[in-house]
Regions:
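Intrinsically disordered, low-complexity N-terminal regions enriched in serine/proline/glycine
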Residues: 102, 198-199, 203
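A polyanion-binding, active-site-adjacent surface
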Residues: 1-159, 173-183
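Short, flexible loop segments at boundaries between secondary-structure elements
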Residues: 164-199
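Amphipathic, non-transmembrane alpha-helical secondary structure
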Residues: 133, 137, 201-204, 208
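A charged, well-structured terminal subsegment
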Residues: 204-218
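Intrinsic-disorder-associated interaction segments
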Residues: 8-15, 192-196, 200
Length: 218
């Protein structure tokens, strides 16, 4: 089953005209949030993962290119790059080993390869914030994992420090993680190997400890 959170016109603020222009943009990326839970799991804890934006790489669609964050809906996308594989393995471990419900979304809802969205970021910021707040209310996460600075900034007025610590932000529990596309030296600040896969293994352990576990941790 799928559910869509409508955005009333009044919530658009001064972005209505800009959004209408996007529909005719030759290269417009939009990712549908993904809500996942392992079949048969009852009353799971909830983890919300907030990433950056619906990036489109070498994909001139000529129109709206609709997908999901990190292409998670597609087995092909889940395996085509180290960045996707790392994030998808992290999510799959949350679903299988922690048996939590995962909601995967972007803080910046639109992407264009030109400067259209960035040049109007001041106007879009309010709209993106409104939608993210609606998602927070609908999903009611026990823990939020942000990926990168944009996502951390969207959750808190004062950016949480990236690393492996769960912090309390506006009555929400937040783990501000590095983005999967971050430079290796960022990961090396936390794990000796500097490998993003090892870093996200550590992130998983923190989430596992914070939320508790029904089975055995590998």
């Amino acid at each position: 089953k799928a559910a869509v959170l409508p955005v009333p016109h009044a919530r658009m603020g001064n972005c209505g005209t800009l959004v209408n222009q996007l529909w005719n943009h030759p290269d417009f990326g939009l990712d549908m949030p993904t809500w996942m839970v392992k079949r048969g799991v009852k009353d799971p804890r909830r983890v919300m993962i907030v990433s950056q934006d619906p990036l489109r790489t070498n994909h001139k669609a000529g129109a709206l290119a609709l997908s999901t964050p990190f292409g998670f809906h597609s087995a092909d996308y889940r395996s085509i790059s180290c960045q996707n594989r790392t994030l998808c393995r992290f999510v799959e471990r949350l679903l299988e080993e922690c048996e939590v419900c995962v909601y995967l979304t972007d803080c910046r809802k639109f992407y264009t390869s030109d400067n259209f969205v960035n040049s109007h970021k001041g106007q879009f910021k309010g709209l993106f914030g409104n939608v993210l707040n609606d998602e927070l209310k609908a999903f009611a996460p026990n823990l939020i994992v942000t990926l990168g600075n944009y996502a951390a900034d969207a959750i808190a007025a004062k950016r949480p420090r990236a690393g492996l610590a769960v912090q309390s932000v506006n009555n929400l529990k937040v783990l501000a993680a590095y983005h999967t596309g971050a430079r290796p030296n960022h990961f090396k600040n936390v794990v000796e190997s500097g490998r993003k896969s090892d870093y996200f293994d550590e992130v998983f352990k923190v989430v596992h400890k914070e939320l508790g576990k029904r089975g055995k941790q590998r």
